[in-house]
Amino acid sequence: MKKIFLIPAILFLSFATAGATEQDTVNRCAAIIHDFRRMPERAIPRDVLRHARGLAIISVFKAGFIFTGKGGHGVVVARTRHGWSGPSFIATGGAGWGLQAGAQVTDYVIVLNNNGAVRAFSRGGNVTIGADVSAAAGPLGRTAKGAVAPTAAVYTYSKSKGLFAGVSLEGAVIGTQRDSNFRYYGRPVRADEILSAIAPPPPGAAPLRRALSR
């Protein structure tokens, strides 16, 4: 029975990401950053972004009825001496039980507040939020407390149906997409090479880097 209900969710998630290229993912992440910057009084405080050592940006598709499936793709970037790094591709996914029908898309921004958080994503494996890096729901608004003196290695934010929120992502597992990095950079490249800017950002990363630098 569980497999019967899970199949529609898996099919939806497959169709939702089918045909999406790495450049599509980068463009989507640039649009997410624009959205989060557009209403600073309701979204991520400017000081949080100004002091960030890196950002993980991901869109998660969730669908199903009774049994739900979810999956998401995105990128992580780091601040270097020469500006923002190129994107290293990441993904998350899973299945669970819930009284939910239909489909939902939620955009997440994970602010990497220190170099330790950047190193966790640079290892090129899986990062478990709350275990590999301490996490807290991020402060919201222009005058939010914690904007200058972070209380956790990462702050987590979400936007769904136009509503911004600081959210808990405790237990979420995010993994490096080595195949996507290979396709985007045209050669085998490690996450640490990307996030340290040893691997130069491809021209297609320019819109995302501009969005981050505003």
Tell what function each PLM region has.
Residues 9-18:
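Hydrophobic h-region of N-terminal signal peptides that target proteins for export
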Residues 1-4:
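Positively charged n-region of N-terminal signal peptides that target proteins for export
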Residues 20-214:
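Small-residue-enriched, tightly packed secondary-structure blocks
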